[in-house]
């Protein structure tokens, strides 16, 4: 059977092993070609082809609920559930998502993109099933990397104690995003490669195969008994101690073996863990060799895996400056939550291994760990995607800001990204500026980024700087770094008619918008505020009082954002300026090219210029109407006085 002939996952149950192997090869080809064109998560999906086939053979989706942790590895699932003909639109504006999305299919149950959540949701769905008297299965598919997140253990502890019937499929590829770290990774490795267990398993199998006539039957019987043997040879069975039945490890690229073990799990009455060992990037040599690089990213050459040359990214600039500062100051440390490459810290990890800490997918721990480092006299920098910092908000407030500790939050992917609602970095400005003691910065370009990082490390308190994903602007980089005055912005150009205030990279957009306005004889002041908190009150108040027409522009949510901060400042000082706020409205932003969304929200030079013109037009219209309004008010007031005097 070809993939194009597949109308639903129920057809998989009737396919022979050879047909399944052919289908697996075709699925890998489709995924490779699509991701090479559109970008996306290549290696994780290549590694789960056979596992996904087996899941849909054993379980009856959508009645049985298959939940994909993070769900970046759900491409195969999408192809098997009727989305082949839309698959070429993967991650494109108006196309299908790179993660599960219930709006797309009844086979998708959550709109996910963060790690370690699937077991909690599965336990909740299973409990709802039991309360309703239903009997469908609930399966959580989670990677070994996601098991470094504490939330997964909270759910395992709950399910094991409660004996809720739920199946947890542990996809163990020893990687997740980057090479896994920590005790759990080492524990799983011992299960996979423990010499006692593996040696006995091999020797027994070989001996049984040699028995004439009954060898195969004896081997099958031994397979059924091996769980008991495993208890004797692998000590401290973690999952068993939590109350789960443990099955595995199983070859994650053997469909028949996977089907057998999943059927066993389905037959168990209580919670079960199925340990599946896979190869990330399976079937594509360059993805197998460099699974970290091909975890997720942009387009590449399908034959070689190479990407085109280009200028430095903001992440790379950040990483280079971190190395420079660490060489000068032995107190500088770097922390990542399983994203060394994505955050630009790979070089730092090589040069300063003693001051580099990958804590796994554990953002809460990362922030409080940074607080401990700072309390001990170090200058820690936690490099984290904006969307993932949300997971550690309490720790930022309670363990860092309340203690007023010198922890730097280097917030990558601040703004719009291709991956959609689960990954948009648009909330950080609003939630960080509400925190006392916190300094919040946004650079207009990569040169300002390096000065802001130095500023944060010189500051004796918590500081955050947010910068976007992707290529930097290509401006020259200063050799000598200088700390910026805290709370001081920059006037990029003076103007008399309207003030354009662009946060971060929007400052450059405002500068170009000012040029467009100048062509229409409109004089625009352009301000790079640099600081969300503390604001440059003197500069912003001058713009409000002297210019009167103000447009704030931010690649962040409007609710509680930078524009709101400016309005609060004006209200507190009685400044009667007309303020037009531009940014992300009160909605979740879907997947697609950020440029398309910037255009939709008017966050382009043309869009900003148009809003500024419209604001000035309204102000002129209001000014022209003021004499008429005043005369109507006088007439109404005169009439009221006349009525009070008995006049008619």
UniProtKB/Swiss-Prot annotation:
> What is the recorded function of this protein according to its Swiss-Prot or TrEMBL entry?
Catalyzes the acyloin condensation reaction between C atoms 2 and 3 of pyruvate and glyceraldehyde 3-phosphate to yield 1-deoxy-D-xylulose-5-phosphate (DXP).
What family does this belong to?
Answer: Belongs to the transketolase family. DXPS subfamily.
Q: In which pathway does it act?
A: Metabolic intermediate biosynthesis; 1-deoxy-D-xylulose 5-phosphate biosynthesis; 1-deoxy-D-xylulose 5-phosphate from D-glyceraldehyde 3-phosphate and pyruvate: step 1/1
Question: Which Pfam families is this protein grouped with?
Answer: DXP_synthase_N, Transket_pyr, Transketolase_C
Taxonomically, what lineage is the organism?
A: Bacteria, Bacillati, Bacillota, Clostridia, Eubacteriales
Residues where Mg(2+) binds: 144, 173
Q: Which cofactor does it need?
A: Mg(2+); thiamine diphosphate
Provide a GO biological process annotation: 1-deoxy-D-xylulose 5-phosphate biosynthetic process
What is the official name of this protein in its record?
1-deoxy-D-xylulose-5-phosphate synthase
Molecular function via GO: 1-deoxy-D-xylulose-5-phosphate synthase activity; magnesium ion binding; thiamine pyrophosphate binding
What EC number is given for this enzyme?
A: 2.2.1.7
Species of origin? Symbiobacterium thermophilum (strain DSM 24528 / JCM 14929 / IAM 14863 / T)
Where in the sequence is the signal peptide annotated? Answer: none
Look at the named UniProt entry and state the broad enzyme category this protein falls under.
transferase
Q: Which residues form a coiled coil?
A: none
State the UniProt keywords alphabetically.
Answer: Isoprene biosynthesis, Magnesium, Metal-binding, Thiamine biosynthesis, Thiamine pyrophosphate, Transferase
Reactions it catalyzes: D-glyceraldehyde 3-phosphate + pyruvate + H(+) = 1-deoxy-D-xylulose 5-phosphate + CO2
Q: Which residues bind thiamine diphosphate?
A: 72, 113-115, 145-146, 173, 363
Q: Which SMART domains match?
A: Transket_pyr (SM00861)
Query: According to the record, how does the cofactor bind?
Result: Binds 1 Mg(2+) ion per subunit. Binds 1 thiamine pyrophosphate per subunit.
């Amino acid at each position: 059977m070809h993939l194009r002939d597949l109308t639903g996952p129920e057809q998989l149950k009737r396919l022979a092993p050879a047909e399944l192997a052919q289908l697996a090869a075709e699925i890998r080809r489709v995924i490779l070609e699509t991701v090479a064109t559109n970008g996306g998560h290549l290696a994780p999906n290549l590694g789960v082809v056979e596992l996904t086939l087996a899941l849909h053979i054993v379980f009856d989706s959508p009645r049985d609920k298959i939940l994909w942790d993070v769900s970046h590895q759900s491409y195969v699932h999408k192809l098997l559930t009727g989305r082949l003909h839309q698959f070429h639109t993967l991650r494109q504006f108006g196309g299908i998502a790179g993660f599960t999305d219930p709006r797309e299919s009844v086979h998708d149950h959550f709109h996910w993109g963060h790690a370690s959540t699937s077991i909690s949701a599965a336990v909740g769905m299973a409990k709802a099933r039991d309360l309703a008297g239903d009997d469908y299965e609930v399966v959580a598919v989670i990677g070994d990397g996601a098991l470094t997140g504490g939330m997964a253990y909270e759910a395992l502890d709950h399910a094991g104690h409660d004996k809720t019937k739920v199946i947890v499929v542990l996809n163990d590829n020893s990687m997740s995003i980057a090479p896994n770290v920590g005790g759990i990774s080492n524990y799983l490795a011992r299960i996979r490669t423990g010499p006692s267990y593996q040696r006995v398993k091999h020797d027994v199998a070989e001996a049984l195969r040699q028995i004439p006539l009954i060898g195969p039957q004896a081997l099958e019987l031994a397979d059924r008994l091996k769980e008991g043997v495993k208890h004797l040879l692998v000590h401290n069975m973690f999952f068993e101690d939590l109350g789960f039945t443990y099955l595995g490890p199983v070859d994650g690229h053997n469909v028949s073996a996977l089907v057998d073990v999943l059927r066993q799990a389905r037959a168990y009455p209580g919670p079960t863990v199925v340990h599946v060992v896979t190869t990330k990037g399976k079937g594509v040599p360059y993805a197998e060799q460099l699974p970290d690089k091909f975890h997720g990213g942009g387009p590449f050459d399908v034959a070689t895996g190479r990407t085109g040359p280009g200028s430095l990214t903001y992440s790379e600039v950040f990483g280079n400056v971190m190395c420079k500062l660490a060489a000068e100051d032995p107190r500088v440390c770097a922390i990542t939550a399983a994203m060394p490459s994505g955050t630009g810290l790979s070089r730092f990890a090589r040069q300063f291994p003693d001051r580099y800490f990958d804590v796994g997918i554990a953002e809460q721990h990362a922030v409080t760990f940074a607080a401990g480092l700072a309390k001990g006299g170090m200058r820690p920098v936690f490099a984290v995607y904006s969307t993932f910092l949300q997971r550690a908000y309490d720790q930022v407030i309670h363990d860092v800001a309340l203690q007023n500790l010198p922890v730097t939050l280097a917030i990558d992917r601040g703004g719009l990204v291709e991956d959609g609602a689960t990954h948009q970095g648009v909330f950080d400005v609003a939630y960080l500026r509400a925190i006392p003691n916190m300094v919040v910065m946004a650079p207009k370009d990569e040169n300002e980024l390096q000065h802001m990082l130095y500023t944060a490390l010189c500051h004796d308190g918590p500081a955050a700087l947010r910068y976007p994903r992707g290529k930097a602007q290509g401006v020259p980089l200063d050799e000598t770094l200088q700390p910026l005055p805290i709370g001081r912005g920059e006037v990029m150009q003076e103007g008399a008619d309207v003030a354009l205030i662009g946060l971060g990279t929007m400052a450059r957009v405002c500068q170009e918008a000012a040029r467009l306005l100048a062509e229409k004889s409109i004089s625009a002041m352009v301000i790079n505020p640099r600081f969300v908190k503390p604001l440059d009150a003197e500069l912003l108040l001058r713009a409000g009082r002297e210019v009167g027409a103000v447009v704030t522009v931010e690649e962040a949510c409007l609710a509680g954002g930078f524009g709101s901060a400016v309005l609060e400042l004006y209200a507190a000082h009685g400044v009667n300026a007309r303020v037009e706020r531009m940014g992300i409205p009160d909605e979740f932003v879907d997947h697609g090219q950020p440029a398309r969304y910037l255009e939709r929200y008017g966050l382009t030079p043309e869009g900003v210029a148009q809003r500024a013109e419209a604001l000035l037009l309204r102000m002129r219209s209001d000014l022209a109407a003021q004499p008429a309004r005043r005369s109507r008010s006088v007439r109404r007031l005169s009439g009221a006085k006349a009525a009070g005097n008995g006049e008619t």
